[in-house]
Amino acid sequence: MTRETALETLADSRRRIDELDLRILELLNARARVVEDIGRAKRILKMPIYEPRREDEVYENITRHNGGPLPSGAVKRVFERIIDEMRNVQKLRMLDKRDNG
């Protein structure tokens, strides 16, 4: 690879990363909207926000479907963070008394 080719590859790869980041953001917000629905339902059903068994199911599902190159441990850590933030979204929805179901 020449210097010129390397610079082109770098610029193109960064552009693709920016596009992927926007897609990830779109998916995270779509997931948060679903989590809001779950929060509403859990509030009505008087269920807890934290359900360790359900979270374990999510981790098992994503690691089972992981085709790499990201190691499954790394994928799980990313999802742990996502789920933690989604739990916060769910808490806010469950505390929102304006939505009476």
Regions found by a protein language model. Name each.
Residues 1-101:
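Domain-level signature for soluble enzymes in the chorismate/prephenate branch of the shikimate pathway
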